[in-house]
Regions:
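Active-site/catalytic core of tyrosine-dependent DNA strand-transfer enzymes
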Residues: 11-18, 67, 92-137
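C-terminal secondary-structure termini that scaffold catalytic or DNA-interacting sites
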Residues: 59, 72, 78-86, 90-95, ...
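C-terminal catalytic core of tyrosine-transesterase DNA break-rejoin enzymes
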Residues: 35, 39, 45-46, 126-129, ...
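Short, leucine-enriched amphipathic alpha-helices that occur as contiguous helical runs
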Residues: 17, 29-31, 120, 145-146, ...
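Catalytic-site neighborhood detector that most strongly recognizes the C-terminal catalytic loop/helix
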Residues: 3, 11, 68, 159, ...
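Basic, Lys/Arg- and aromatic-enriched nucleic-acid-binding interface segment
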Residues: 1-50, 58, 109
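DNA/chromatin major-groove-contacting recognition/catalytic segments
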Residues: 6, 15, 19-23, 73-79, ...
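N-terminal core-binding DNA-recognition domain of tyrosine site-specific recombinases/integrases
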Residues: 6, 28, 117-121, 137-143
């Protein structure tokens, strides 16, 4: 990702995402797909390749080991984008419950079944529908990944920890998101003020 692309990066905050997602609760598969994308930072191909065997609800872990594409009308499973893309992603309890509820609603799901058995085109259309219904600013589906990374940066996690979670080859890629939170400089100055006053320097 070049500097120009980084500067143009658009994201949703947690509240913006919630408003969007609330408008898609009529389609469970769509709603869950966006929940997973926003709260894990998975790439769209990684999400669509997930099978129930890859999702350990008891251990609260998703294993990423493949990617999905739809080529010439056929489902194609390929290796992940990069070696670092092979990873395990821990998921929060609320997402475990969302996936379990969804799984319980299905008729006899098998381990080899895809969790989200749709295409990227379907999810892109559903995203357009959700943005129209919610009035949210328009972003691309890949921007849900940007939103997750930006959320983690804002929560104070290190670039290394974030890079491992989202499968970046280098922490340099993760650092390119930092410009999204210019107030961090102000926070740093404020904390230095507080530190000086506490120590009576």
């Amino acid at each position: 990702m070049g500097k120009a692309k980084a500067d143009e990066m658009e994201i949703w905050t947690k509240d913006e995402f919630q408003q969007f997602a609330d408008c898609l609760m009529d389609k469970r598969v769509s709603w869950l797909a966006y929940q997973i994308l926003f709260w894990t930072g998975l790439r769209i191909g990684e999400l669509l390749a997930l099978t129930f065997a890859d999702v350990d609800l008891e251990g609260k872990v998703i294993t990423i080991n493949k990617s999905y594409q739809r080529l010439k009308g056929k489902d194609v499973i390929t290796p992940p984008k990069t070696p670092k893309s092979n990873r395990k992603v821990n998921i929060p309890q609320f997402l475990v419950e969302d996936i379990q509820d969804y799984k319980d609603s299905l008729y006899d799901p098998q381990l080899e079944d895809r969790v989200i058995p749709v295409t990227k085109t379907f999810l892109e259309k559903e995203m357009q529908r959700g943005m129209k219904l919610s009035g949210m600013k328009k972003i691309h589906i890949h921007s849900l990944r940007h939103s997750h990374i930006s959320l983690l940066i804002d929560m104070g996690f290190t670039a290394l920890a974030i890079a491992e979670r989202v499968g970046h080859e280098s922490i340099d890629i993760t650092y390119r998101y930092a410009h999204l939170f210019p107030t961090r400089q102000v926070e740093m100055a404020d904390k230095l003020d507080s530190l000086k006053n506490e120590k009576g320097v």
